[in-house]
Regions:
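Nucleic acid-binding interface residues in structured DNA/RNA-binding domains
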Residues: 2-120
Length: 120
């Protein structure tokens, strides 16, 4: 399965909606990794699915997609979308998230400490 086919097949799905619900919970000034979001959405080992779900968002989406970064504490490059990478860094900086000279942020300092929500 190609990335494009995987992305198209998840649009609007239950998994996609669960991912977006988790991303909406990430507080201002904090970041979460793709893998962390996947686990919290009940989709362990599905970090790529998180990336596909975020990539499918419209540019005017209220979902704080910019708060999701890779496990190395970096903004993941997007093929053909260098402006999105810059936008992500600018939005995070505006929230107080700092990056070092190599483009890495401290997950220890800025990482979101969340737990899965319990069902009622």
């Amino acid at each position: 399965m190609t990335a494009a086919r995987g992305r198209a097949s998840t649009t609007g799905s239950d998994s996609h909606q669960r991912i977006l619900a988790v991303v909406r919970r990430i507080p201002r000034g904090r970041v979460a990794t793709y893998g962390q979001v996947a686990v919290l959405a009940g989709l362990p080992r599905q970090a790529r699915l998180v990336g596909y779900a975020l990539h499918a968002l419209h540019s005017d989406s209220a979902v704080p997609w910019h708060r999701v970064i890779n496990a190395q504490g970096r903004v993941s490059p997007r093929a053909g979308q260098s402006a999105a990478d810059t936008t992500q860094r600018i939005r995070l900086a505006a929230e107080g998230v700092r990056f070092d000279a190599s483009g890495r942020t401290s997950l220890k300092r800025y990482g979101w400490r969340a737990t899965a929500r319990r069902s009622p």
